A protein has these predicted regions:
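Composition- and surface-driven signal marking solvent-exposed, interaction-prone regions
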Residues: 31, 82-83, 127-128, 150-152
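Secreted, luminal/periplasmic, and some membrane-associated catalytic domains
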Residues: 1-89, 93-95
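Cytosolic regulatory/linker segments at or just downstream of nucleotide-handling modules
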Residues: 152-158
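Short, solvent-exposed coil/turn linker segments
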Residues: 45, 50-51, 119, 130, ...
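Terminal low-complexity/disordered tails
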Residues: 138, 142-147, 160
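A generic structural signal for short, solvent-exposed coil/turn residues
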Residues: 9, 61, 105, 146-148
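Non-transmembrane alpha-helical segments in soluble domains
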Residues: 32, 36, 135-139, 155
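Substrate-binding rim/cap in mid-to-C-terminal beta-strand-loop elements of soluble/periplasmic
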Residues: 2-25, 96-141
Length: 160
């Protein structure tokens, strides 16, 4: 590759889109329009396009990327830069299988959070939790407070 405007960094069921010049509003608008057209067309496996701002606000995901592309639930994204850009399912690379990561929290595997110990209340069940609350919970169990972090300790589990 000798010249580029944008590239995709795969996270399997989602992909981060980086721009060569994130400050170039014309480029940003062009790439956004193209991504939205791919999403609307329905054949490229894109279920949703997030701007960086939407990804941070809705999913606590932030970084130097400009967009996040979420799978339609059936498509894995790769890092190939050569044609063909759309290929049949191939499980030779574990990152692009059907049982992988990179989904939005309400899709794909739903991991279990389980805790036991002298500072954990017994019999507590939460139907849903937030990953951003796990580190503050662990810190609280250790008697420390995390500074400059998102999320809150899951007090429901903790003994007073």
């Amino acid at each position: 590759i000798i010249s580029w405007d944008a590239f995709s960094f795969s996270n399997a069921m989602s992909s981060l889109i980086y721009l060569r010049d994130p400050g170039d509003k014309t480029l940003q608008e062009r790439v956004y329009r193209e991504l939205m057209a791919y999403c609307k067309e329905g054949i490229y496996g894109i279920g949703r396009v997030f701007t960086a701002e939407e990804a941070e606000k809705e999913e606590h995901l932030k970084g130097d990327f400009s967009f996040v592309v979420e799978s339609d639930g059936y498509t894995s994204f790769a890092d190939k830069a050569v044609r063909p850009l759309v290929v049949e399912f191939d499980d030779r690379d574990y990152r692009f299988g059907h049982a992988t990561h990179g989904y939005l929290p309400d899709r794909g595997a739903q991991p279990v959070f389980a805790a036991q110990g002298p500072d954990i209340r017994e019999g507590i069940v939460l139907e849903r939790g937030k990953v951003v609350d796990e580190a503050p919970t662990y810190a609280s169990l250790l008697g420390v407070t995390l500074l400059d972090t998102e999320g809150e300790p899951m007090e429901e589990f903790l003994k007073a």
